């Protein structure tokens, strides 16, 4: 509370420095918050496109696999899937967006040529190949969606954290500091007025004493 602060010139200078530092910090955090929101909106737009693409790829993959099962049978489809020898590889790196570390997910060996799928060209139909193509496309969409969704969550968390810090400065710390400054200013002004009043009394008393001394000296001179 303001009343807990000792009203001295030193404390006034310290609290003014804290106000200046806090206001500059508040401005910096506001700029960061606004920048994060803009970046988040860009990622949100991208996320909507990615989700739409993912849903479309999922529906296509389901249609292709259902068609392959209907035409070739579950045994043939399962056998083609089990023949896969080289699995996709996922690598995760990071990227910094305004101080927020977000993942960059790269997938390799997802899309394969016919001879890399393990089941061979002969003995399978175009339906199975189309289903494989569709699921490879779906897997790449899933990887991209995971990257974008994770980035969006991290950005949103940082935005909320920054907003809380801005609000703490704006609605708690800065008002308390300004209240403390006003309290010290008021007390110092009171002390200054009291000191001026005291000095005036001393001056008046001194002048009265000098005047009395002058009158006494004059009376003594007249009596002589």
Curated annotation (Swiss-Prot):
The keyword Protein transport does not apply. Residues 215-224 have a biased composition (Low complexity). InterPro entries: V_ATPase_D. GO terms for molecular function: ATP binding; proton-transporting ATP synthase activity, rotational mechanism; proton-transporting ATPase activity, rotational mechanism. Gene3D superfamilies: 1.10.287.3240. Residues 200-209 have a biased composition (Basic and acidic residues). It is a peripheral membrane protein. Belongs to the V-ATPase D subunit family. Component of the A-type ATP synthase that produces ATP from ADP in the presence of a proton gradient across the membrane. This is A-type ATP synthase subunit D.
């Amino acid at each position: 509370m303001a009343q807990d602060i000792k009203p001295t010139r030193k404390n006034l200078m310290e609290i003014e420095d804290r106000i200046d530092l806090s206001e500059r910090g508040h401005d910096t955090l506001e700029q960061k918050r606004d920048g994060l929101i803009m970046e988040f909106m860009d990622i949100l737009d991208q996320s909507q496109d990615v989700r739409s693409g993912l849903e479309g790829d999922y529906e296509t993959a389901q249609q292709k696999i259902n068609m392959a099962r209907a035409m070739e049978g579950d045994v043939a489809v399962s056998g083609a899937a089990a023949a896969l020898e080289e699995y996709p590889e996922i690598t995760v790196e990071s990227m910094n967006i305004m101080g927020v570390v977000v993942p960059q997910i790269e997938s390799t060996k997802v899309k394969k040529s016919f001879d890399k799928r393990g089941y061979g060209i002969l003995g399978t139909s175009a339906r199975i190949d189309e289903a494989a193509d569709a699921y490879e496309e779906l897997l790449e969409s899933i990887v991209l969606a995971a990257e974008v969704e994770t980035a969006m969550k991290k950005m949103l968390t940082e935005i909320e954290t920054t907003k809380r810090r801005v609000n703490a400065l704006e609605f708690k710390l800065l008002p308390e500091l300004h209240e403390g400054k006003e309290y010290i200013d008021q007390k110092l002004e009171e002390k200054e007025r009291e000191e001026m009043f005291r000095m005036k009394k001393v001056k008046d008393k001194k002048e009265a004493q000098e005047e009395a001394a002058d009158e006494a000296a004059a009376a003594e001179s007249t009596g002589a």
